[in-house]
Amino acid sequence: HFQNYSSTKEGPLYSISLWGKRIPKGVNRGFILSTTKNGVSFFLQNIPKIQGNTTNRIGSFSTSXGXKKTFAYPHETXNTMLFPLLILLLFTLFIGXXXISFDNGGADNGIGGLTILSKWLTPSINFTQESSNSSINSYEFFTNAIYSVSLAIFGLFIAYIFYGSSYSFFQNLDLQNSFYKESPFSYFFDKIKKNIYSWSYNRGYIDIFYTR
């Protein structure tokens, strides 16, 4: 499945950004986040320009009408993956609070032999305990949740920097360009960002696990 971005304008004055949309050549490529009249484009300085016949580099596909159209990048899955992920999200949110208690599990009820995942399924907050113990468990629960949630939010923030949508309301804040200043360390940090992006794009972390 590919998202349709038909190349109606052929020529060297246009290049394809990370999101597959055509961006005019006259964009300031010194910034990681470059602002154009139509929106924001990410990491344009490393995007190769596609000149002339784009059929050899991307591929040409025929539609039912018989007209050839060029597609720039694969389209993300729609509701086929969205609904299963939402179902998994519900289990992820509530399994820690509701969970399944194995305190009474033993030879009497036959649950004792099925406790492989008992530690994962044991509720973090036991509502049957006294109020003092419940408050302590609640404090531990939220303390442990802060670290994991903070790490997840930090990962989302990094992903937004690299892959954030150009139609987001954050584009008016001009965050990255406001932090970017000409300094002796700007080139060094920009080089690090490019290496991290290239490493993650080429799935270097997967190669490390497979080579072990």
Swiss-Prot record:
Catalytic reactions on record: a plastoquinone + NADH + (n+1) H(+)(in) = a plastoquinol + NAD(+) + n H(+)(out); a plastoquinone + NADPH + (n+1) H(+)(in) = a plastoquinol + NADP(+) + n H(+)(out)
Keyword Transport part of the UniProt annotation: yes
E.C. numbers: 7.1.1.-
Domain of life: Eukaryota
Subcellular location(s) per record: Plastid, Chloroplast thylakoid membrane
Record-annotated membrane-spanning stretches: 82-102, 145-165
Position of the signal peptide: none
Keywords, alphabetical: Chloroplast, Membrane, NAD, NADP, Plastid, Plastoquinone, Quinone, Thylakoid, Translocase, Transmembrane, Transmembrane helix, Transport
Membrane topology: Multi-pass membrane protein
GO CC, alphabetical: chloroplast thylakoid membrane
UniProt entry tagged with the keyword Cell inner membrane: no
Pfam families (UniProt xref): Proton_antipo_C
Coiled-coil parts of chain: none
MF terms (GO), sorted A to Z: quinone binding
Similarity section: Belongs to the complex I subunit 5 family.
Self-association and partners: NDH is composed of at least 16 different subunits, 5 of which are encoded in the nucleus.
Purpose of the protein: NDH shuttles electrons from NAD(P)H:plastoquinone, via FMN and iron-sulfur (Fe-S) centers, to quinones in the photosynthetic chain and possibly in a chloroplast respiratory chain. The immediate electron acceptor for the enzyme in this species is believed to be plastoquinone. Couples the redox reaction to proton translocation, and thus conserves the redox energy in a proton gradient.
Record protein name field: NAD(P)H-quinone oxidoreductase subunit 5, chloroplastic
UniProt organism field: Avena fatua
Organism classification: Eukaryota, Viridiplantae, Streptophyta, Embryophyta, Tracheophyta
Gene: ndhF
